[in-house]
Amino acid sequence: MKKIKLIAALLSVLFLTGCVDQSGNQSADNDTKEKRIVATSVATCEILDKLEVEGVVGVPKTDSYSIPKRYENAESVGSPMAPDMEIIKSLKPDIVLSPNSLEGELKSQYENIGVESYFLDLKSTEGMYESILALGKILGKEEEAEKLHQEFEDFKNDFAQKHNEQEAPTVLILMGLPGSYVVATESSYVGSLVKLAGGVNVYGDGDGQDFLNINPEDMVEKAPDIILRTSHALPEQVKKMFAEEFATNDIWKHFEAVQNARVYDLDNEKFGMSANFQYEEALKELETFLYQEGTN
């Protein structure tokens, strides 16, 4: 695999490569010249918008989420899962930004079209903010990045103090897909939010796997206090699927969480696949589910 040689101005960001992985075969300078940027996910666009970056020339095609108004005139480069390499190449970007969950699929493709790429850690809120710090250095937005990071640290510390004396509830998280579902672990974004809120995932970090295929018979043995349900896409369709599954599959009647009406459906815009800036609202919503008795 070809190793990138970045010029000296970028060497200061190498300590953050755990958060932003770098690839490609072009060098990029960190001067005052506005870089041409392609962002292949909505979450990445939102980060750039928060950093007040203007040079975005390519954005993902999406029917479910809104692209920041700042980038409404940027070229569509196709779906986040499979961006169009020919369109990206035609835009002559200095940098392409994508989530690191897709690095295995996209890294070699970016190399093949000769563009430099950066992969952001969007698997947790903490990872997102470390990536923001790295991008601040790369894009000359260090002040904005530091401000955002400090705001997150202040919120996180204040939030952690609210329930540190309370018993942590155990939680089962189901991530729905049309026609099926998987278990989300602490390694997933929604799982990281539950952990940040003080919940204990009954499947832990899944040995580093974001999602696990588990049958309900095994889940019931974990005896979760709470069941949370969210979706990867098509939220209304998935919500109906979950309702039918829980109504027709007798195994769910044996869960104390079901018996105690502690099953909650989450908004997939806040509790989706990638970290985003709705984490404050998400944590406050989780707070009501984790620490107060409730009903569906």
Each language-model region and where it sits:
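Bacterial N-terminal signal peptides that target proteins for export
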Residues: M1-I7
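C-terminal motif of bacterial Sec signal peptides marking the signal peptidase cleavage site
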Residues: F15-G18
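Structured C-terminal subdomain patch of bacterial secreted/periplasmic proteins
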Residues: K35-R36, Y129-I132, K137-I138, E146, ...
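A short, structured surface patch at a secondary-structure boundary
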Residues: R36-L91, I95-S101, V202
